[in-house]
């Protein structure tokens, strides 16, 4: 059996099925509120962003941690974060970061910070993910997916602590997206002092379960699959948040989130069920915010095995799948067909690329040319969970399965672990 799957985009992949233009957030107008309840769609994996891969985890962690650099609100331009400025050498290989002074850490019942954020913490964030000798490399998990998928371990040649507030990173080669990579959620900075204290106490896992950050909120309480409670951090370097109490009410079912919103049990919810959109838009008490998502859903092939090592087979599969039918049936017109693995809201998106047409006759010919005139059998893995870019992976897989059967490809649907 050969294998291909429908999944999220953790890095550079070879094929895709749909980019989402989806209502990302909606809510009841809440003026000058001191408490906001957010109906989150799931529990975080943990409170260590370095090994997180889901939006729910990043949403939970982004309240707690700051990053060295950030993306501007609503865009992808890189702006200062914990680094107030930086310099790049003429050859594009040396980045010198000048860090903010006076950035405070959250308090913890087992740890009271004795110093502000400094270069040691930035270096700890990078070395924990990229240096196997770091004592925290394997704590919670050693699977630093984003860091590895971006090639950081091979890209970073050296990290130099120039002084308490200056860090110099030398790369093996120029890398245009390096700053953008550091602005992503996985690069949230943890306290090295806190990590050292918990390591000495024999409880290193506490760092990822009872987090200490420099972000706008500190964690008050977390009950898995139920609630996360945050409190605004008065000493946040960018100014105290306008909302005093932030509550994540974990609600996995989109229709239940909508019901809670209607009853006033939450003020904000993400990713409504497409079937509820008409009612949502007609409700005068609801404000709907939507834009093209910064994500894609895709169909990935295992190109190391036959027949997917042959581009003609991959092209045939792409031409055999009716993307419009998937968008109409699953996304209810809130998605758009993707023609490359970069979402349209990203700066490097190339709109000039032409997608393959839906043409099953041409797909059959390509299979025959590749030596598969009678088709073949394969596994089709689908996510068992709902994601913003894929609200019903099983249904999408079933639609793909039916399309592929028409060109002689027998696909058996299985569950992919994501």
Q: Can you describe what each PLM-predicted range is?
A:
Residues 13, 130-195:
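Surface-exposed binding/hinge segments that line
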Residues 39-91, 127, 212-214:
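N-terminal lobe/hinge region of extracytoplasmic solute-binding protein
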Residues 72-73, 153-154, 164-165, 175-241, ...:
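Gly/Pro-rich hinge or "lid" segments in bacterial periplasmic/extracellular proteins
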Residues 84-135, 168, 260, 307:
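Aromatic- and charge-enriched surface segment that lines or borders ligand/interaction sites
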Residues 181-182, 304, 308-346, 392:
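Periplasmic-binding protein-like
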Residues 205-208, 233-279, 397, 410-412:
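Ligand-site clamp/hinge motif
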Residues 217, 337-370, 385-395:
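Structural transition elements
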Residues 224, 346, 368-417:
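Ligand/substrate-recognition segments at binding pockets and active sites
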């Amino acid at each position: 059996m050969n294998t291909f799957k429908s999944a999220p985009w953790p890095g550079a992949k070879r094929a895709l099925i749909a980019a989402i233009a989806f209502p990302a957030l909606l809510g009841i107008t809440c003026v000058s509120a001191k408490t906001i309840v957010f109906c989150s769609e799931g529990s975080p994996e943990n409170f260590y962003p370095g090994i997180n891969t889901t939006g729910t985890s990043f949403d939970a962690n982004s309240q707690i941690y700051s990053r060295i650099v950030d993306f501007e609100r609503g865009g992808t331009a890189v702006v200062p974060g914990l680094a107030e400025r930086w310099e790049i050498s003429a050859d594009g290989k040396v980045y010198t970061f000048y860090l903010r002074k006076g950035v405070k850490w959250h308090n913890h019942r087992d740890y009271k910070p004795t110093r502000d954020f400094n270069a040691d913490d930035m270096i700890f964030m990078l070395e924990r993910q990229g240096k196997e000798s770091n004592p925290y490399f394997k704590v919670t998990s050693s699977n630093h997916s984003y860091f590895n998928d971006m090639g950081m371990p091979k890209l970073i040649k050296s990290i130099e602590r120039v002084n308490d507030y200056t860090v110099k990173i030398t790369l093996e080669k120029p890398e245009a997206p390096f700053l953008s990579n550091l602005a992503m959620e996985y690069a949230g900075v943890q306290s090295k002092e806190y990590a050292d204290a918990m390591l000495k106490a024999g409880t290193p896992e506490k760092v990822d379960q009872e987090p200490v950050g420099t972000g706008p909120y500190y964690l008050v309480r977390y009950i898995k699959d139920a609630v996360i409670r945050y409190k605004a951090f008065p000493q946040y370097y960018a100014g105290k948040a306008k909302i005093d109490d932030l509550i994540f009410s974990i609600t996995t079912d989109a229709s239940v989130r909508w019901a809670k919103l209607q009853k006033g049990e939450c003020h904000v919810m993400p990713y409504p069920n497409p079937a509820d959109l008409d009612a949502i838009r007609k409700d005068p008490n609801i404000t709907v915010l939507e834009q093209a998502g910064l994500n894609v859903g895709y169909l990935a092939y295992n190109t190391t095995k036959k027949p997917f090592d042959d581009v003609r087979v991959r092209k045939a599969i792409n031409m055999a799948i009716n993307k419009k039918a998937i968008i109409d049936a699953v996304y209810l017109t809130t998605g758009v067909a993707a023609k490359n693995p970069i979402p349209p809201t990203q700066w490097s998106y190339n709109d000039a690329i032409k997608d393959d047409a839906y043409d099953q006759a041409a797909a059959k010919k390509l299979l025959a040319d590749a030596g598969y005139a009678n088709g073949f059998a394969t596994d089709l893995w689908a996510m068992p969970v709902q994601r913003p870019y894929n609200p019903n992976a099983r249904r999408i897989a079933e639609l793909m399965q039916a399309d592929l059967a028409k060109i002689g490809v027998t696909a058996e649907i299985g569950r992919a672990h994501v």
